[in-house]
């Protein structure tokens, strides 16, 4: 039997199996202090929707997180990042948000870090344009909500069950929410506890 034609398949299969057994912790080290420094004012989706950068941010005591919306994108003296940098604050600002981010999106971002928030200081900017009759639109929800943050939020050990239930109930109101069956199950199981 000639193995030569099957050699690429065998090699790729072996490599695949090796990657299956590699510990996930080897890949989370990709977010370094340099990554934090490079992304502290970038306002990218990687920061807004990701969990690894925000996890590393709250492990560090070097940065002061500021959660907000379009006001973080403005290049004027009232931008919190610019204002605090001019004051020579003891910690560098780390901006998290984007235009169209509303209270629910920022609340989910913070809730995904619930177990890391004890003793931490941060700013949560509440924007007047959030207070409308229609609330968060489906379009903004789809563009800015992160499934990885939702998953991390519901895995927070110290978060009270009634708070998880309220988040599940609110997320179920959006037609494009992922894992609706999981959210329904979570809401139902937590209803018995509250």
Where is each model-derived feature located?
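Positively charged n-region of N-terminal signal peptides that target proteins for export
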Residues: 1-5
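Hydrophobic membrane-insertion alpha-helices, especially the h-region
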Residues: 7-25
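Membrane/wall-proximal cationic-aromatic binding patches
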Residues: 28-91, 109
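Membrane-embedded segments
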Residues: 73-160
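Ser/Thr/Gly-rich flexible loops in soluble cytosolic domains mediating phosphotransfer, phosphorylation
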Residues: 144-182
């Amino acid at each position: 039997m000639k193995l030569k034609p099957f050699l690429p398949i065998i090699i790729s299969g072996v490599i695949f199996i090796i990657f299956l057994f590699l510990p996930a912790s080897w890949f989370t080290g990709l977010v370094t202090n340099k990554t934090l420094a490079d992304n502290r004012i970038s306002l990218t989706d990687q920061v807004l929707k990701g969990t690894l950068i925000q996890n590393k941010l709250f492990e560090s005591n070097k940065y002061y997180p500021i959660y907000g919306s379009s006001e973080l994108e403005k290049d004027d003296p009232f931008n919190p990042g610019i204002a605090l940098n001019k004051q020579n604050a003891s910690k560098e600002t780390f901006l998290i948000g984007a235009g169209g981010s509303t209270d629910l999106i920022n609340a989910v971002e913070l809730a995904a870090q619930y177990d890391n928030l004890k003793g931490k200081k941060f700013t949560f900017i509440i924007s007047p344009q959030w207070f409308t009759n229609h609330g968060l639109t489906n379009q903004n929800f789809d563009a800015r909500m992160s499934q990885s943050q939702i998953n991390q939020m519901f895995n927070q050990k110290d978060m009270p069950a009634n708070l998880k239930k309220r988040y599940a109930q609110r997320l179920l109101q959006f037609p494009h929410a992922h894992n609706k069956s999981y959210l329904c199950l979570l809401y139902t199981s937590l209803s018995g506890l509250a």
